[in-house]
Amino acid sequence: MAEQNAVATQQGTQLSVAAQVKSMISQDAVKKKFAEVLGQKAPQFLASITNVVAGSAQLKKCPANSIMSSAFVAATYDLPIDSNLGFAAIVPYNNSKYNPQTRQWEKHPEAQFQMMYKGFIQLAIRSGYYEKMNCSVVYKDELVSYNPITGEVEFVTDFSKCTQRAEGKSENIAGYYAWFKLLTGFRKELFMTTAEVENHARKYSTAYRYDLENNKKGSKWTTDFEAMALKTVIKMLLSKWGILSVDMQRAIQDDQKVYDEDGEGSYGDNQPDIVEAQDPFSNIEQKEEEQQIGGLDLEEVE
């Protein structure tokens, strides 16, 4: 009986969050805010928020304000939030907070805005500084040499003799590669071995470490390692060597920011240089009272 009540409560909460998001989207004040940054594309983008929430049981555990705020960040970059497209995503994340009353760390499900690798490439293209750019998985039979000191990478000249890419086996992946060429002629490349990317993920993602230690699948690094690896190399390449437009600088700061129930943005997954952000929906009265979300663990993927 207790289990049935718990399931019913969880389903009620998820329905409530979905209803809250739908209610907020229908408000004139919200429509106006999105129209200010997206123009005529705003209605289509708002509809996509509903679809994203409907397709994720984990997002339905997050506060509606958190979801809407993350979506608004994506809207300011004019990037779609369908994670399958690879530009940007709204990802559920367990943000640990200290409760002074219980003197314990407690997990709070929140929505996290994430730039994906195609999103960084898109913003770079829009800047008008870049002539060419790409990032790719590199298989072992495609790599001739890599010098970690100079950063120089040499690939085979005849890819027709390489077979591992067609096979697509992860154990044959040597690493991940990104490069760009500016209109000025300046060219830069970055290669990271699979081990280097793995170490990067372990260092900067508490969610990924939790997954590895507890055999879970709640982190984007666990469920889509390749996409996160490509994002890592292109982001590191651009942030170190690229010409960053204002939007690119903002995107690097906003990437993986989570929003709490008070509408404040912070980095919840080992991200440095915390920047506070105002919730654009904090002054908009919701038609439905938000229900308290407790006892839910995003690491328990359904």
Residues covered by each model-derived region:
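Glycine- and charge-rich intrinsically disordered segments
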Residues: 1-32, 248-302
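Binding-interface segments
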Residues: 13-244
